A protein has these predicted regions:
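Domain-level signal for soluble alpha/beta catalytic cores
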Residues: 1-475, 481-796
Length: 796
């Protein structure tokens, strides 16, 4: 019933829960979900008020109910979730009197932990934590699952899979973006939409973090890419304080006006988040009830994504880097056998630097545990590179293992026209999402004619439809056959390429260098064939981006066909190169600064050792290490460096520091730690992702961080500050209900150690609110904490 209404009529969620619970007596540090059992009538009253205000869907009070947060609670997770669903259902019975159909959604929030490789929580452990909640929610009678306030695309993938694989309920998912349209972990709107649609959520969107006005540009971006119905749940503006109470500055009537604009733009499910009340929802419903909803429109865009950004195929030709593949590469084979990850990662980084848009990943080698190696390499590559990856394997087990842990929507290389192969691959594409390469080969082999290959392409496309896989998620490879053995091979390939684009309207890909096997001076043949293929409709070429011949063909073609506006890219690459001058050779080794910027730990270790032969340890720190960290930090602020890369660079810097410290210890010296800083997540809040990121960065700038952990009472923070004579304290809070604890901590610090400075951060905070609670500094991102610490200790 819900899915029949979704996208065809406007549906209404409820509003905020936390601030209403505070008004009813929820104390700082008290878990809101426990009220499902200890104050059930209060919870039922809140739900009832939302139903009476016009909500079609009410969220259970289970935002933080997962196995990680409730592992040592006095109540079992099943008790909490069951009570949460039952309370909402009782409220529907009491609060809905007009006969309309209403729904109870199992509300699922983040775990509060950062997933590996950035944090310490494994993907499968996150999945298991969500899985329990999902199962209990369905058993208790939930009508749908709403995953919300997610700031990490990897965590939301774990949650969506847990819901899809363990329940039969509809799944909604909403993310929390910043004002730049980015997740905490760096993902942008196209990347998030691409991944969530690949995972087949029933609706997606945005919630929390900002008011309705600030959400308008993000919604506009979502509308460009989303084919499924869209959810929008803003806060009631910005948090303020009045007479010691927190309130939000967008009143119900103003909120309703913005929500009408949001419906006009194309939202299908609307509601409220922090600070919104039944009054906000009632006014929103009254204002928009007669508005017609725009139907969700299918977007025929072929997109793949990493955690950070999406790549669109079908317009400007894309480059798929081919070098992470052992075929014909002795050093690469040895690196796989020796588990030399830095060598392999360096191949990926080099291709990214040379202009690749997607990286092919193939680890097929005898005596290698391919599924395990593929998983490890995929995770490692996604830290050092923000490019989407192409999972290249004929091993179905390895393919599934990689697709499951991949953070984004990958390209998958490949499926072919053999029924057995399609039966194995298409279920994985349906389950995990991906753009799959279809090879035009079937039980009869590779057709000799263009029409034969077009026929196999059609067979693959039709079979995919049976699994609900749209043709936008299929890229056809008509196969480049070597002309040394098949003289008509190039002509047949180019003809098939053109026909596939014209007849089926799908994107295409080729392993370009296959055309020249067995010939002398292969780059000449490859580069000319590459140009011909692009002219005939090639969407993406699997090539070596380090080949000057291939890249010259690529940049020239893009400039000539006006894919490169004003020839800007061509001029950037070749503007300083004189005719007839060969391109500079690639360096064999990276400098320490380069190794840190690229997050290569072994390279950083080696480069530090080499520098120590000619420079003093402290000179290396000041002239190489700190400038490298500054470069990465500035890139993070600008959005050109993503959180995984920031943390990987920090790890590489740690390795370099360790080498330097060892040398100093042998010489009887030491690296003097800088001043001490306390970090803590305040009482009642167990979300410490942001705090942990700040800790890593401060330590890399040699600050001595005292990490008091999470759910820390004000007295503990202040006692430590006094005992240790601390000059700077950093406080973190994610939830509206715990910002009160932050204010209490600051007040106590002002009483007992007034000279101590306080910096605050968290999703529910902003500069105005930081000022109101008495903080000295608001950190909108992790790097800001470093700059402020430097200012406090006079290091700027």
């Amino acid at each position: 019933m819900l899915l029949e209404r979704l996208g065809k009529e406007l549906l209404y969620f409820d509003g905020g829960m936390g601030t209403l619970l505070q008004s009813k007596g929820l104390q700082p540090g008290e878990l809101p979900e426990v009220w499902n059992l200890e104050h059930a009538e209060e919870i039922i009253d809140i739900h009832k008020a939302y139903f009476e205000a016009g909500s079609d869907i009410v969220l259970s009070n289970t935002f933080g109910a997962n196995a990680i947060k409730f592992h040592d609670s006095k109540y079992g997770l099943k008790e909490i979730v069951t009570a949460g669903i039952q309370n909402a259902k009782k409220a529907a019975e009491r609060g809905v009197h007009d006969g309309r159909k209403t729904y109870v959604a199992l509300d699922v929030g983040p775990t509060g932990k950062l997933l590996k490789p950035m944090g310490d929580l494994s993907f499968e452990d996150a999945y298991d934590a969500f899985k329990e909640t999902m199962i209990y929610g369905e058993q208790a009678g939930a009508d749908l699952i709403h995953i919300e306030t997610m700031s990490d695309s990897y965590e939301v993938k774990a949650a969506v899979l847990a819901a899809k694989e363990n329940t039969s309920l509809p799944v909604f998912a909403t993310m929390i973006f910043d004002e730049k349209g980015k997740l905490l972990t760096g993902g942008d709107v196209p990347a998030v939409v691409t991944m969530l649609e690949g995972l087949r959520v029933d609706a997606l969107g945005i919630n929390c973090g900002m008011g309705p006005e600030q959400m308008l540009p993000i919604l506009e971006d979502i509308l460009k890419y989303a084919s499924v119905p869209i959810i929008v749940k803003p806060n009631a503006g910005l948090p303020k304080q009045r007479d010691g109470e927190v309130y939000y500055d967008v009143e119900p009537e103003q909120f309703a006006g913005y929500m009408a604009k949001i419906v006009e733009m194309g939202a299908h499910v609307i509601g409220g988040c922090c600070g919104t009340t039944p009054a906000h929802i009632q006014k929103m419903v009254e204002t928009t009830r007669e508005m017609s909803v725009k139907p969700a429109t299918k977007k025929d865009i072929t997109m793949v994504s990493s955690y950070g950004h999406a790549v669109i195929l079908g317009g400007k030709p894309m480059i798929i880097g081919e070098r992470i593949n052992p075929t014909g590469k002795k050093k690469f084979k040895q690196a796989l056998k020796d588990h030399d990850m830095d060598y392999i990662l360096k191949e990926g980084i080099t291709q990214q630097d040379k202009g690749a848009h997607i990286l092919d990943v193939n680890v097929g080698l005898p005596d290698i545990d391919e599924p395990a190696m593929m998983k490890e390499l995929i995770m490692a590559l996604q830290i050092v590179s923000s490019l989407p990856l192409q999972i290249d394997t004929v091993d179905i087990t390895a393919m599934e293992a990689a697709m499951r842990i991949y953070n984004g929507k990958p390209m998958v290389n490949s499926v072919n026209g053999k029924q057995e192969n399609m039966d194995a691959v298409f279920p994985l594409i349906k389950r995990y999402g991906g753009v799959v390469i279809g090879l035009t080969i079937d039980e009869d082999g590779i057709p000799a004619t263009a029409d034969g290959r077009v026929r196999v392409a059609g067979k693959i496309i039709e079979e995919a439809k049976k699994y609900g896989i749209d043709k936008k998620d299929i890229v056809i490879d008509v196969l480049a056959m070597t002309i040394s053995s098949e003289p008509e091979g190039a002509k047949v390939t180019l003809e098939a390429l053109k026909k596939v684009r014209e007849i089926y309207g799908v994107c295409t890909v080729l392993g370009v260098s296959n055309i020249s096997f067995g010939l002398p001076y292969r780059p000449a043949v490859n580069s000319n064939f590459y140009t011909m293929a692009m002219q005939n409709g090639l969407s993406a070429g699997i090539i070596n981006p380090s080949s000057e011949d291939m890249m010259r063909s690529y940049y020239s073609f893009c400039a000539l066909m006006n894919y490169d506006k004003n020839c800007e890219e061509y001029i950037r690459v070749y503007g300083s190169q004189k005719a007839g001058t060969p391109a500079p050779a690639a360096k064999a080794e990276l400098t320490l600064k380069e190794a840190i910027e690229k997050g290569l730990k072994e390279e950083a270790h080696h480069a530090t050792g080499e520098l120590l032969k000619k420079q003093a340890p402290l000179e290396i720190i000041n002239e190489h290490l700190i400038p490298a960290l500054d470069t990465v930090g500035k890139g993070f602020e600008k959005g050109t460096v993503f959180l995984p890369q920031l943390l990987m660079s920090a790890d590489a810097a740690k390795i370099a520091f360790a080498v330097i410290k060892d040398v100093l210890a042998q010489e009887g010296g030491e690296v003097q730690a800088k001043n001490k800083v306390i970090l803590a997540t305040v009482k009642g809040d167990i979300h410490d992702i942001g705090k942990n990121i700040v800790k890593v960065l401060l330590e890399n700038y040699s600050f001595d961080v005292i990490d008091l952990g999470k759910d820390v009472p004000p007295e503990v923070i202040v006692d430590t500050a006094v005992e240790q004579d601390i000059r700077l304290v950093g406080l973190s809070a994610l939830m509206t209900t715990t910002v009160v604890s932050m204010e209490e901590t600051i007040k106590l610090l002002r009483e007992r150690k007034p000279e101590c400075k306080v910096m605050v951060g968290g999703a529910v905070l902003n500069q105005d609110y930081a000022d109101m609670i008495g903080a000295d500094f608001y950190g909108k991102d992790a790097m800001q904490s470093v700059y402020y610490a430097q200012r406090v200790f006079g290091e700027e």
